[in-house]
Every structure is written in structure tokens, then in C-alpha cells.
């Protein structure tokens, strides 16, 4: 008997009902930046009904006095002096709205997904505000690298400059570094004498080599700097000559200030080790008929609002340094 192909197939124009698509109700994962800058800054708060400007002060350190006091003579009183630093908070806000019909027919939990996406925007906003404050002093805190790419020597040089200016490390007795993954690659590939490869012969490199395995999400410590990675770093230049900022931060470098009860509200992401908050806790408001929307055409709103500022706390002795390094990978 002669071979006869199937008459009915999925591409047959006679069977249009087969031309259907199954739509997954679960959104695919997003590529998101990790937020590191708020974590290395110093937190503070303005109480409500106390204005929107905060002022800090510090006493100027006195020098030594090696002159012996003359016997029987009352000396001269030493005057004390202070300096002040001020910062003014600003409002940041965004919202997204969903129609009632979209809320009724969407195949996904559309309000929840809108809230999650807007929350990431809020978290990225805070991280970038703090990073921009770090970058604003680049001309005063920049340290030249020994070569085009970052090395352990460069990190050690930043630590030496900071300690040479009497800048203390952070509370864990280490300076904190924020670094792009491309720069981490170059540091790990540093095979010069005293470089990463050489140092790891005598150290326990497991945390650094295994990536963000530490409980605090860091890449490990090298050259006196405990490092966290993120792609949300400052850059300069254009491809293929982009320079990536590497931040080495001591205690009291940059402050972050919120208005009491109206500051950023982080949601810690358990999927990200050491996460300081990858999203915001946004407000979700269900719609319905109201004087502004008598017909109830708006089904829901998601929004955030926070009052915040980042400020360099010491512009006489900057308490951090920035390296600008090319990346061998790109």
C-alpha cells in the first residue's frame, strides 16, 4: 500500500484551534545588581519635626606639648576648636499603577510582580545615591594603579595611604572594599612577587577562590581589604577602555542619613548571601471607586517614598581611597 502522510498536523490551516500557546505563569529570573554601598557607610537618623538638615561636629585633635611647665607658674589655657559637617535630606519616590481589568485578567500575580520590580528600583536608587557621594571626591581620593589592571599591590597601597593618614579600619578591624567582578579576576590572576597567587601559597584561600561563600557575602580578604563584589561601581571612559572604580573604605568615611520613619526600608533577600537588602518594602494600595477614580478603573498602586541623603563625613582627611583600573577581560 502506498505511503500517505498525515492529513492533520499542528501546522494545518484547517485546524486553527491547534495554533495555541501555553503561557507560563511564573516569571523568569532577572539579572540584578547587588547593593554594597549602603553597608559600608555610617548610618544616622534625623528625628521627626527636627528639620531636614543634620549637622555633625568633631573636635580638632590637639598636637603634643613637649615644653616642660615652668615651676610655680600658671600656664596658658589651650583653646579648643570644632568643625561641622551638614547634610540636607531629600525625598525620593516612584509608583506604578495597574488597571482593574489588567488585575482581573492577568495570568501572573501582577500586583506582586510590579511591587517586586519597583522595590528593586528603590534599592538600586539608594545604593547609587551613596556610591555617587563616594565618587564625588574622586579627584581627592584617587590612587594610581601600578599597571593597567588591579593587583594586590594596589590594594596594599590604598591601605598604606589610609593608615598613613591615621584612618582606622572598620569595626571588624579590616578595611572594606567594593570591587567589580572584572577587577576581582585581575587580582586573582596577579602572579607577581607578593601578588595574589604568591600570597595564597601561604594562606588559606578557600573563601576567596570559591567566590561569595563567606557568611557576610564577601569575596574574602587580601592585602588588608575585605572585598564585596558588585557591578554597580563608578566607571569612566568608553569601551574598550573603561576604567572601573575600586573602593577601599575605612571607618567614618561616608554617612547615610534618613528621616525617622521615612527612611529606606530594606527587604533582605535570603537567596543572596550577606545581602544588605536587594529590594525595598514597597506600599501596595488596592484601588476601587473613590473621588479621584469614581469608576474604579485603577485596580491597584505600588509605590515607595523615602527621605535620605549621603554625605562625606571628613573632607579634611578623606577616609577612603578609589582605584581606577582597566579590566583584562573586556
Predicted regions and their residues:
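Residues at the C-termini of beta-strands that transition into short coil/loop
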Residues: 60, 181, 231
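Residue-level detector of secondary-structure boundary/capping sites
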Residues: 47, 109, 146-149, 153, ...
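A generic structural signal for short beta-strands and their flanking turns/coil linkers
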Residues: 50-52, 173, 223
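Short, solvent-exposed loop/turn elements at domain surfaces
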Residues: 63-67, 186-187, 237
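Sequence/fold signature of self-assembling virion shell proteins
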Residues: 2-40, 105, 153-156, 190-330
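N-terminal "assembly arms/tails" that initiate or stabilize quaternary assembly
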Residues: 1-88
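Long, contiguous amphipathic alpha-helices that act as assembly "spine/axial" helices in icosahedral shell
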Residues: 56, 81-143, 167-181, 294-309
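Extended, solvent-exposed, turn-rich assembly/linker loops in the middle of proteins
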Residues: 138-220
